[in-house]
């Protein structure tokens, strides 16, 4: 992925799995919990898993998904 490099430093500091409830907090508000839930319901979000009642994302999948939607502006 062409934008993958911008997330390399972030990847090293995150846990391997992130709950949907914490994505916004961990990524500095880049995407809200509600927006992520809506994208998931439309099949447009990152790959997800359910652990108990929580929706979670592998950090690798989440960052890969973000990289495909990132446009670097000059």
Give the location of each predicted region.
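Short, well-ordered alpha-helical scaffold segment located
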Residues: 22, 61-62
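Small/flexible residues
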Residues: 13, 50-52, 56, 60, ...
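Intrinsic disorder/low-complexity detector
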Residues: 5, 40-42, 63
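Polyanion-binding surface elements
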Residues: 4-35, 68
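Major-groove DNA-recognition helix of helix-turn-helix-type DNA-binding domains
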Residues: 26-56
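A short, Lys/Arg-enriched interface patch at domain edges and termini
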Residues: 62-74
């Amino acid at each position: 992925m062409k934008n993958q490099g911008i997330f390399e430093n972030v990847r090293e500091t995150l846990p391997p799995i992130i709950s949907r409830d914490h994505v916004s907090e961990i990524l500095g508000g880049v995407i809200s919990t509600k927006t992520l839930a809506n994208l998931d319901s439309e099949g447009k979000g990152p790959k997800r898993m359910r652990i108990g009642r929580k929706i979670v994302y592998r950090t690798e999948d989440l960052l890969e998904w973000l990289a495909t939607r990132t446009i670097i502006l000059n």
